[in-house]
Amino acid sequence: MNAQELDDVYTRLAYALTEVGEEKTSMVLARLVLLLMQRVGDASAVSAAIDDAVEGFRP
């Protein structure tokens, strides 16, 4: 995915989350993550992405 595609997909996600509303955002993101995990199909790659995502947020 190039930079423009990444920006387009991020923008699409932002609009979709706005459309469903703040109260449903976490559920939509959780569902999206589960769907992407299935499509990636590589447990170590998904685990590494989880580690990257939480970096800087852990106490």
Per-region residue spans from a language model:
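Amphipathic alpha-helical interaction segments
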Residues: 27-35
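N-terminal intrinsically disordered, cationic/polar leader segments
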Residues: 4-12, 17, 23, 37-43, ...
